[in-house]
Amino acid sequence: MSEPTTTPSIRIGTAPDSWGVWFPDDPKQVPWERFLDEVVASGYEWIELGPYGYLPTDPNQLADELGSRGLKLSAGTVFTGFHKGDDQWKRAWDQALDIAGLVSKLGAEHLVVIPDLWRSDATSEVLEARTLDDEQWAKLAAGHDRLGKALLEEFGIKQQFHSHADSHVGTTREVERFLAETDERYTNLCLDTGHFSYYGGDNLKLIDDHPSRIGYLHLKQVDTSLLFDVLKNDVPFAEAVTQDIMVEPPHGVPDLGPVIEAVAKIDSEIFAIVEQDMYGCSIDRPFPIAKRTREHIFGETAAARVS
């Protein structure tokens, strides 16, 4: 008798971002205790740290708060601007010491690294040119490889680079160049399905072309009926978020089931974190969306698992 086949699967978690949390402290945002309670009620076991300072930063307190709810931590997040020059190293490493230092004590093995935006997500002010020159690209790549190497050596943490709307690495061509100029031993991708689709990226093709560079997933969908207006009228990403550019599944692109299945075939230890950008929403809105999104994902594919 042949052995039954097992469908490869990956862990599905969520993040403060799906509750509208972008900043450590903001009166518009849901209190952190309520966030954790609603995560549990939504059926998730894995979360990201979110902005440093939103959840408790004392490792013992955070471990108690998560453990009492049966929750576990998959990653933290830092922001970098290596294309600006060597002076950016201290800023990046100071963040890493705090954030990687915290999450590693709770068993997390990943750090999601987001590049500085050329347009402010707080004020929508244009801060710098939209594209990088060759020298800036070289600084960007070298900085991330240095960071990834240091994270591995100091904390056993893997760097997962997150391309982003309104950043210098967003389009397919830009992501491909970033991969070509960085070392996969130290720098790989947190593939955010919504941000990559924001500029027309084909998530499945990227996964197929670069399976060894996919280290982490953020699951979200972009509303294409709104996207073309956003791009045509040069609407800042932060403003587009308030218009629900990142839409509740299944009302956008890409289809999440095929993405999850493709990544599960690469490595069943990869995390897929649901991350629907909702900053500025009412505090009562995220919870029902989180429940429906989880139900949608688990109804769409057998390659999703809770733990």
Where are the regions that the model predicts?
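Acidic/histidine-rich catalytic cores of soluble enzymes
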Residues: S9, T14, W46-I47, A141-V253, ...
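Short, flexible, mixed-charge acidic loops at enzyme active sites
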Residues: D26-P31, L117-V126, L226-E239
